[in-house]
């Protein structure tokens, strides 16, 4: 219980760190170091703790360390219970973002497809896949995702903006 609480507190600290009310830079360094120590302790005690891997991957992503973020999200996905479809879809989304940042668009697309197989109406996955398909020049496929998103939410600004991008290129 104590370790879960420490991990939860680490997550709260990370959220505070990344918020617009962030501390001064030197205090941020100490906060990140403390948070990473908590994650390391958690993983030393439970090397298959997928939630801690996920949280630390988010922290590394926030710091711009894509190599470590990718390693941790790979472990999170490896250990995630397959029955936790919503959370597993979120893990695939994070890995897609990491891969996209690394310039691995096709691998990112594979992960977005995996997230949508788990949760077919996942709005963020549809938006992200539409955006990625636009970047890859696959405008017809992107249009399908944006229209799907628009059917789910008739006021979706992401869908409208995506469709406008598609129209500008076709």
What is the predicted role of each segment?
Residues 55, 87-90, 94, 128, ...:
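Canonical tetratricopeptide repeat
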Residues 45, 79-83, 118, 152:
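Structural marker of alpha-solenoid helical repeat scaffolds
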């Amino acid at each position: 219980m104590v370790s879960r609480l420490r991990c939860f507190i680490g997550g709260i600290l990370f959220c505070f760190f990344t918020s617009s009310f962030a501390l001064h830079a030197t205090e941020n360094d100490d906060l990140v170091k403390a948070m990473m120590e908590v994650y390391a302790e958690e993983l030393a005690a439970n090397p298959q703790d997928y939630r801690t891997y996920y949280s630390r991957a988010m922290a590394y992503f926030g710091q711009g360390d894509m190599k470590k973020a990718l390693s941790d999200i790979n472990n999170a996905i490896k250990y995630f219970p397959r029955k936790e479809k919503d959370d597993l879809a979120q893990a695939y989304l994070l890995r897609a973002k990491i891969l996209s940042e690394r310039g691995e668009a096709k691998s990112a697309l594979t992960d977005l497809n995996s997230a949508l197989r788990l949760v077919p109406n996942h709005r963020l996955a549809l938006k992200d896949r539409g955006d990625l398909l636009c970047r890859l020049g696959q405008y017809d496929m992107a249009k399908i995702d944006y229209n799907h998103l628009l059917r789910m939410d008739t006021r979706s600004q992401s869908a409208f903006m995506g469709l406008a991008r598609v129209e500008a290129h076709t």
